[in-house]
């Protein structure tokens, strides 16, 4: 196929699509190369400034300070050497499949040269292109690079081959909140307070970085070996970058209110709703459609939304922890969507499951208009004065015992994850297209990453 471009003198110049694709790839490659140089220089300056600040706080002699500076310089040299090493799937041994999502799988793997255990997320490039997931993949990788703190699952490496994208992340053996809720049915108010507080701290931390998660749900709340929580799955996260924009919710938001009239499922008591929810929950987690149960109404409307949408999701999770099912659950996504959009009438608290007025009021403050929503004005500070969170040690909560202890027998214990006996351990692959590369492969340029701290693990 041929495409035309207009020259400066007004004449039309015709180029083949192949030529235009090559030109685009060259442009993106050069832009990323120089952007990386600037970023790396800035990161080195930040690490050096952090070291100098630490040296000022320590009572050291000048010779001791100089020794630490030399050690730091050596670490920087080792990191540059590590970055030049090409990492591939052959450097890891697959131990077990521990997760399946709509667009990929997660494996427990062991790095062959060090023996360290990681979680490897594998995404097929062809699927990402076909299902318009490139922006989501880019967003997840970029957020995991930037969000380097205790409330977000740590990514150590990202790399690619001609078929797949790979994210190498820390393995959190406690499983996820969805699995915990399916085991426990409901949590006590004390346990709910603990997990909602930790999730609030995690949400607040990414908001301070300028990101909105948009997909806060139990599946994406992972538990470490001590039972403390970390946020994961940033595929729908949005920030300030154009590459993170998405039309993910376009289909549902274009539906007319009349499309949902008369489709509401027949009323069920709370016990039947909980049983129905548990029966279908796992399948929803693995489907490409997913569930709209945790999505704020303003996200569906696409009239503009901000960080407040994550606080709505937190309120829905809090309701589920106490009731055994989310407030808007239905037999199908259309009914759920209708209930979310009509939350003033559908957010109800069944009398057969008694909860405190403080808990009820907190949920209502989360699940309300965006501009009045708890967390929408001052973030975490809004929560600290709420009676339900009375007694929470916000500064040291992660140092305290978790509400529900996690039993971990070894570094590769997967007992808190689902079993996938029918899934091969072999990394999924596909025939490489003629010519040796996937069309539009340039969209994955600059995906490769190695974290500075990883040199301590080598």
From Swiss-Prot:
Which segments carry the region annotation Interaction with mats and Mob1? 118-179
Protein residues bound to ATP: 98-106, 121
Q: What Gene3D superfamilies does the entry give?
A: Phosphorylase Kinase, domain 1, Transferase(Phosphotransferase) domain 1
Q: Which residues form the active site?
A: 215
- Where in or outside the cell is it found? Cytoplasm; Nucleus
* Swiss-Prot/TrEMBL cofactor(s): Mg(2+)
Top-level class of the enzyme under EC nomenclature: transferase
Residue list for modification Phosphoserine: 287
Gene Ontology MF terms? ATP binding; metal ion binding; protein serine kinase activity; protein serine/threonine kinase activity
EC nos:
2.7.11.1
User: Which CDD domains did the record assign?
Assistant: MobB_Trc-like (cd21780), STKc_NDR_like (cd05599)
* One GO term of the biological process aspect: microtubule sliding
Task: List, alphabetically, the InterPro entries matched.
Answer: AGC-kinase_C, Kinase-like_dom_sf, Pkinase_C, Prot_kinase_dom, Protein_kinase_ATP_BS, Rho-assoc_Ser/Thr_Kinase, Ser/Thr_kinase_AS
Instruction: For this UniProt record, give its keywords in alphabetical order, as a comma-separated list.
Output: ATP-binding, Cytoplasm, Kinase, Magnesium, Metal-binding, Nucleotide-binding, Nucleus, Phosphoprotein, Serine/threonine-protein kinase, Transferase
One cellular component term from this protein's GO annotations in UniProt: cytoplasm
In which broad location class does this protein mainly occur, judging by the first location in its UniProt entry?
Answer: cytoplasm
- Residues annotated as domain AGC-kinase C-terminal: 390-458
Instruction: Outline what the protein does.
Output: Serine/threonine-protein kinase involved in controlling cell structure and proliferation of a variety of polarized outgrowths including epidermal hairs, bristles, arista laterals, and dendrites. Together with fry, maintains the integrity of epidermal hairs and is an essential component of the signaling pathway regulating dendritic branching of sensory neurons. Reduces neurite outgrowth by phosphorylating pav/pavarotti, thereby inhibiting its function in microtubule-microtubule sliding.
Q: Which family does it belong to?
A: Belongs to the protein kinase superfamily. AGC Ser/Thr protein kinase family.
Q: Quaternary form? A: Interacts with, and is activated by, Mob1.
Q: What is this protein called?
A: Serine/threonine-protein kinase tricornered
Q: What is the lineage of its organism?
A: Eukaryota, Metazoa, Ecdysozoa, Arthropoda, Hexapoda
